C-alpha cells in the first residue's frame, strides 16, 4: 500500500520534493516509479518481502539504517507513507520515521488501515500505528472501512485508486504550498511552529 501511494504521488508530479520508495519486496519495488528507490533489509528478506511479519519489517529497516539516513539527511519535511497491517509498513515505517525525526525533519505519517474483516491484520496495524505516532509529529490515517463510503460501489482496485489520489493530492498540496511561491504564503517556519 505504501509504495502504491508513493508511485501515485510521483506520477502526480510534486514540485519541491524528492519521492523515495523503499520496500522489502524487490518485485514490487521494480514496478514503482520514484525519484530514488532502494531495497530494505536485503539480508533479512532477500528481496522477497516480510510475509506479513512486522518484526521482520523492523529488522529489515534497521539493517538498511545507513541507507535510510543517507536518503533523508537533508530533509526538512518527510512524509512516511505505509500500509498498516502487513510486515514492511507496520514494522518498517516507525523506524524510517524515527530516522527522519533524528535529522530534525517534520515527520508526517500517512497510512492506510486494513478492513475490519482482515482481523489478523487489524491488531498488527493498531500496534504499528501507535509506534508510528510515537515517532512522528502527526499521522494521517486513511481507514479502508471508510473508503467504502467515499468510493461507493467501485471495484476494490478503483477504491484504492481513490485513496491513493486523495493522499497524493493532500501531500502535493502541503509540499507545494510551502515550496512554490504563490498568493498564499506559508513557509517552512510556519509549519514547524504549528507542529
Predicted regions and their residues:
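Tubulin/FtsZ superfamily GTPase core signature
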Residues: 1-195
Amino acid at each position: 500500500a505504501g509504495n502504491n501511494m508513493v508511485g501515485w504521488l510521483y506520477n502526480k508530479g510534486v514540485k519541491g520534493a524528492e519521492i523515495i520508495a523503499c520496500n522489502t519486496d524487490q518485485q514490487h519495488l521494480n514496478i514503482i516509479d520514484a525519484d530514488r528507490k532502494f531495497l530494505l533489509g536485503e539480508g533479512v528478506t532477500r528481496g522477497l518481502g516480510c510475509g506479513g511479519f512486522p518484526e521482520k519489517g523492523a529488522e529489515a529497516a534497521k539493517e538498511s539504517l545507513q541507507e535510510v539516513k543517507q536518503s533523508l539527511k537533508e530533509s526538512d519535511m518527510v512524509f512516511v507513507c505505509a500500509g498498516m497491517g502487513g510486515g514492511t509498513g507496520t514494522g518498517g515505517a516507525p523506524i524510517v520515521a524515527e530516522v527522519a525525526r533524528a535529522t530534525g525533519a517534520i515527520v508526517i505519517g500517512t497510512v492506510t488501515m486494513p478492513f475490519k474483516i482482515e482481523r489478523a491484520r487489524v491488531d498488527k496495524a493498531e500496534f504499528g500505528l501507535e509506534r508510528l505516532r510515537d515517532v512522528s509529529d502527526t499521522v494521517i490515517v486513511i481507514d479502508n472501512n471508510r473508503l467504502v463510503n467515499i468510493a461507493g460501489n467501485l471495484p476494490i482496485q478503483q477504491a484504492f485508486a481513490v485513496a491513493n489520489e486523495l493522499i497524493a493530492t493532500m501531500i502535493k498540496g502541503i509540499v507545494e504550498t510551502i515550496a512554490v511561491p504563490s498568493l498564499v504564503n506559508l513557509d517552512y517556519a510556519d509549519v514547524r511552529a504549528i507542529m
